[in-house]
Design a protein with these regions (language model features):
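Loop/turn elements at helix/coil->beta-strand transitions in domains of secreted/extracellular proteins
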Residues: 1, 42-49, 74-77, 95-96, ...
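Active-site-adjacent helix-turn-beta-strand microarchitecture at beta-sheet edges
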Residues: 1-28, 59-157
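Short acidic, glycine-rich surface-loop motifs adjacent to enzyme active sites
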Residues: 2-12, 34-60
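Amphipathic, non-transmembrane alpha-helical secondary structure
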Residues: 28-35, 39, 249
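Solvent-exposed loop/linker segments at secondary-structure transitions
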Residues: 42, 61-62, 78, 91, ...
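Glycine- and other small-residue-rich loops at beta-strand/loop junctions that grip anionic moieties
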Residues: 53, 101, 172, 176
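Short, ordered loop/turn segments at secondary-structure junctions
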Residues: 54-55, 83-85, 211-213
Length: 258
C-alpha cells in the first residue's frame, strides 16, 4: 500500500494560483493524516506500507521531515523521500528505512520485496552513470523529442562572455551571483520597458526572485531560449507590489537568517 505527503513549505515556495484551495498539513496534523492512511491501507489488506513523500531531511524543514514522521507513526515499513536531494538508502545512526535518490536523475532507487515473507528484502541505488548501454527504441524516441525541442527553443537570443552561476549553495540560495543579478536586472528592465507607470522613482524600483527558482548554469557562449527555460523552468509571472522600505528590509533579513 502506498500513500503520499507533500512538504508544507510548498505553500510559500510556489505560485499561489496553482495551489488555491489546497491545505498543506504540518506537525501533528501531518503525522495524524499519515497514521490514518497507514491504518486504512492495513485494514484494506496491504502487507507492506510505503510512504512516497516530498519532505526531506534538511534541519530547516523540522518539524516536518521524513525522519520525524517515521519516528512518530506505527506500521510504516519504508519511505521514498525527496525535497532535500539527499542520496541515501537509510537515515541516521538508527538506520531508518528512508531512501532518497538525490536529484537530476543521477540515481535509480530499487526496492526488493520478498513475496513469501511479505517483507522488504533490500533497497539500493543504481548510479545512472554506470548504465552505458542504450536501448535503441528509447534512444530513437528521445532523439525525436530532443529534435523538436531544439527546433522550437534552440535559437540564440544572446551571448555571454562568462559563465553564469547556477549553483544552489554556495550560490543563488546563499549569496549574490552573476546569474541572480542578470535575472533581477531583466525583471526591472521588463517593467521599465512596459507601459506600466510606476509611482516611485527609478532608484526605488528593485526586483526580488526566489533563489530556489534558479535551476541551472548558463555557460560562456551563446544563450538559447532552451537554456533560459532550463534555468527558469517554472513559468512564474512578474508581479509589481508597493511596499515600505522597512518591509523590504524585513523580507531580505528573513531570507538570510540562516
Amino acid at each position: 500500500g502506498f500513500f503520499g505527503l507533500e512538504n508544507p513549505e510548498t505553500q510559500t515556495k510556489t505560485n499561489p494560483a496553482l495551489i488555491k484551495g489546497l491545505k498543506f498539513l504540518s506537525r501533528d496534523e501531518m503525522t495524524n493524516a499519515a497514521q490514518e492512511q497507514i491504518d486504512s491501507l492495513k485494514s484494506d489488506g496491504a502487507d507492506i506500507i510505503i510512504g512516497i513523500v516530498h519532505l526531506g531531511v534538511d534541519k530547516s524543514s523540522e518539524p516536518n521531515t521524513s525522519y520525524e514522521l517515521y519516528r512518530n507513526v506505527t506500521g510504516l515499513d519504508f519511505m521514498i523521500d525527496g525535497h532535500s536531494h539527499t542520496v541515501m538508502t537509510e537515515y541516521g545512526e538508527d538506520k531508518l528505512p528512508i531512501q532518497s535518490t538525490g536529484s537530476n536523475f543521477k540515481n535509480i532507487g530499487v526496492i526488493v520485496i520478498d513475496n513469501a515473507t511479505k517483507e522488504i528484502e533490500s533497497n539500493a541505488l543504481i548510479d545512472v552513470s554506470t548504465l552505458t548501454e542504450n536501448d535503441a527504441a528509447v534512444e530513437a524516441k528521445a532523439n525525436e523529442i530532443i529534435a523538436k525541442i531544439d527546433a522550437e527553443f534552440g535559437y540564440v537570443v544572446a551571448k555571454t562572455d562568462v559563465d553564469l552561476n547556477g549553483d544552489k549553495a554556495p550560490g543563488n540560495r546563499t549569496q549574490e551571483t552573476n546569474l541572480g543579478d542578470l535575472i533581477t536586472d531583466a525583471m526591472i528592465w521588463k517593467i521599465k520597458d512596459s507601459e506600466i507607470a510606476l509611482s516611485v522613482p527609478d532608484e526605488n524600483v528593485v526586483a526580488i526572485t526566489n533563489g530556489g527558482g534558479i535551476r541551472a548554469w548558463i555557460y560562456k557562449g551563446d544563450i538559447t531560449k532552451k537554456a533560459i527555460n532550463t534555468v527558469l523552468p517554472f513559468g512564474n509571472s512578474l508581479a509589481i507590489a508597493y511596499v515600505p522600505g522597512a518591509e523590504l528590509i524585513e523580507a531580505l533579513e528573513a531570507s538570510t537568517q540562516s
